[in-house]
């Protein structure tokens, strides 16, 4: 039992009377306590003896106390509407990342397809030899790296509490576990160099750069902990899955010596993400009432309108994809100005350098504006009555609470939806790649515009996304 009887009875009453059921321990709380442990606790094996004391030596209460330290003390009522949205978004981001339903298979598939099937072609301006750059940085091929990540994750996903109690299996791994599977010893060393660190190393990293209580960047960077000798264990399987998805990109990025090379890598990754999204939606819309058009071009000058258009009956969904990563500082520091500036930079842009929603609104004005309508090559838009602007982000921020409403609020300063009358332009919708992957399964039987309209009808502010609805 983790709690004193009087505490346990109160918790049981609270849990039994709550709907939906409440939990005592949750992922972010556990990661937060682990973070404090590596930062401030002594590296002493005798500490483990405390677990044999009654009520875990008080650790249960420490977990409950951790809950009070996970939230930012930001005055809410005195803020503007935009600032209130940012405050809710800051809290939602950490909830989404820790509690959100994340598909392991989607992460594996997305990582593999972006790397192996949909990179920019060799010889194009966006091409970057990520295979060679990653091998130079890590000593591994991308295939070896992904296979080793999947192997470790599979071990932990198959592990049961009963196996651990019966000592039929263990949360601890050794280098021998890999070599028994036929993996070359040098490859194992290279892999563990990338994904693991000792508690002392993690402490140094967190003490050097830590943007707030919810910042688990270093656990994501090194999701496997090295303890005594060559014993290893994964701190968190979701961090391992995130490493599988983005580890190759960041290991390569951190090895590059110039900003020019890093810019080329980011451009390559953005094109790979766009190619992946177009493939996903093309497959989802095939033989359905949704007609999918990737990379549509203006008839007059051949420039790209937006990343894709989907015609759903008399509706048109204009899509823009953004592969940018939102910085840890902006997501976890609690600084409203930092988060606003990052969203402005990555998802909005300026009139001279448009990003995200500025690209979408400009495309809609160009095609449907009363005084500047421009034909789109090979797409008949004459029967379109309603236009849906949809932004898709590779970063999870696209699924956080309030992001659609926040982007709409910002768009109102440079885009008047009434200027497109008699056609109707809906407010802006925003989804993460995880969100669009989820709804793509329904496009064979349902119009995309109907799904978006249903979202709007039930939640006119579009505060809840398809991901946050499941956790908040």
Whereabouts are the PLM-identified features?
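A short acidic/basic microdomain associated with nuclease active sites
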Residues: 284-311
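Conserved catalytic cores of phosphodiester-cleaving nucleases, focusing on short active-site segments
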Residues: 281, 308-310, 317-323
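A short acidic (Asp/Glu
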Residues: 304-306, 396-405
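Interfaces and regulatory segments of ATP-dependent nucleotide/adenylate/phosphodiester-chemistry enzymes
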Residues: 6, 12, 67, 71-284, ...
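Catalytic cores of nucleic-acid endonucleases
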Residues: 323-387
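Extended hydrophobic secondary-structure segments that form protein cores and membrane-embedded regions
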Residues: 296, 386-394
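Long, charged/polar, low-complexity intrinsically disordered N-terminal extensions
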Residues: 1-68
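Short secondary-structure boundary/capping segments
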Residues: 333-337, 403-410
């Amino acid at each position: 039992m983790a709690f004193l009887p009087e505490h346990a009875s109160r918790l049981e009453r609270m849990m039994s009377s709550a709907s939906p059921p409440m939990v005592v321990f949750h992922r972010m709380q556990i990661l937060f306590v682990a973070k404090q442990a590596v930062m401030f606790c002594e590296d002493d094996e005798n500490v483990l003896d405390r677990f044999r004391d009654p009520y875990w030596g008080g650790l249960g209460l420490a977990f409950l106390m951790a809950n009070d330290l996970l939230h930012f003390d930001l005055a809410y009522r005195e803020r503007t509407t935009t600032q209130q949205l940012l405050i809710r978004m800051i809290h939602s981001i950490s909830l989404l990342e820790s509690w959100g339903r994340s598909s392991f298979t989607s992460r594996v598939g997305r990582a593999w397809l972006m790397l192996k099937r949909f990179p920019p072609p060799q010889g194009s301006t966006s091409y970057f030899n990520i295979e060679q750059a990653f091998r130079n940085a890590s000593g591994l091929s991308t295939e070896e790296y992904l296979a080793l990540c999947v192997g470790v994750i599979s071990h932990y996903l198959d592990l049961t509490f009963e196996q651990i109690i019966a000592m039929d299996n263990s949360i601890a791994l050794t280098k021998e576990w890999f070599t028994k599977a036929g993996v070359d010893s040098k490859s194992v060393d290279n892999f563990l160099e990338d994904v693991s660190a000792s508690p002392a190393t993690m402490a140094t990293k967190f003490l050097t750069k830590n943007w707030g209580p919810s910042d688990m960047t270093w656990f994501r960077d090194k999701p496997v902990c090295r303890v005594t000798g060559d014993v290893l264990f994964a701190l968190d399987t979701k961090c391992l899955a995130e490493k599988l998805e983005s580890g190759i990109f960041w290991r390569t990025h951190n090895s590059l010596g110039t900003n020019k090379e890093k810019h080329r890598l980011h451009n390559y990754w953005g094109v790979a993400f766009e190619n992946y999204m177009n493939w996903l939606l093309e497959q989802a819309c095939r033989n359905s009432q949704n007609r999918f058009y990737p990379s549509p071009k203006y008839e007059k000058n051949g420039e790209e309108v937006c990343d894709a258009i989907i015609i759903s009956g008399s509706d048109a969904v204009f899509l823009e994809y953004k592969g940018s990563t939102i910085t840890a500082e902006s997501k976890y520091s609690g600084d409203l100005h930092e988060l606003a500036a990052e969203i402005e930079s990555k998802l909005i842009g300026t009139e001279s350098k448009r990003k995200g929603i500025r690209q979408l609104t400009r495309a809609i004005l160009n095609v449907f504006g009363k005084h500047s309508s421009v034909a789109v090559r090979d797409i008949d838009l004459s029967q379109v009555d309603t236009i849906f602007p949809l932004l898709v982000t590779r970063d999870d921020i696209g699924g956080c609470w309030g992001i659609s409403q926040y982007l709409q609020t910002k768009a109102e300063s440079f885009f008047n939806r009434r200027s497109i009358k008699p056609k109707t332009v809906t407010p802006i919708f925003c989804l993460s790649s995880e969100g669009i992957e989820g709804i793509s399964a329904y496009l064979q039987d349902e119009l995309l515009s109907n799904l978006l309209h249903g979202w709007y009808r039930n939640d006119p502010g579009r505060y809840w996304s398809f991901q946050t609805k499941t956790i908040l």
